[in-house]
Amino acid sequence: MALYEHVFLARQDIAPQQVDELLKTYKNVIESHGGKVERTENWGLRSLAYRIRKNRKAHYVLINIDAPAAAIAEMERQMRINEDILRYITIRVEKHEKEQSAMLSRPDRDDFPGKDEERPRPSRRQYEDVVEGGVE
């Protein structure tokens, strides 16, 4: 059997419990085809780089899998059918990483300090005065 890393993105408007149910469903698909899920990581709700199907955020989930190709094909087929899955990618790897992934240790773009603070912005009149070279 081959080793795979699989990441899928679920819609932002579903509850975290529904994401866990999706994970459980795909885990059962893998196990029913003779594979096993070695590790899962739920990266939580994160911002997307661009909108996907009108979603600006998504629930990210990583699955480390040891399974035959038929199990992966069936899981991907079911993901294509499910409307809650925005994107997925499966990559074959030589070995699985033992420590937690870099995504878990990296803060989300929304977590940076000062993001929600409003910065003072000059009014249009103040801006025009600065551009013209003189301040009244």
Swiss-Prot record:
Keyword ATP-binding: no
Secretion signal span: none
Sorted UniProt keywords: Ribonucleoprotein, Ribosomal protein, RNA-binding, rRNA-binding
GO terms (BP aspect): translation
Kinase listed as a keyword: no
Pfam families the UniProt entry points to: Ribosomal_S6
Basic and acidic residues bias (residue ranges): 97-128
Similarity comment: family membership: Belongs to the bacterial ribosomal protein bS6 family.
Function: Binds together with bS18 to 16S ribosomal RNA.
PANTHER family from the UniProt entry: MITOCHONDRIAL 28S RIBOSOMAL PROTEIN S6, SMALL RIBOSOMAL SUBUNIT PROTEIN BS6M
The protein's name in its UniProt record: Small ribosomal subunit protein bS6
UniProt source species: Bartonella bacilliformis (strain ATCC 35685 / KC583 / Herrer 020/F12,63)
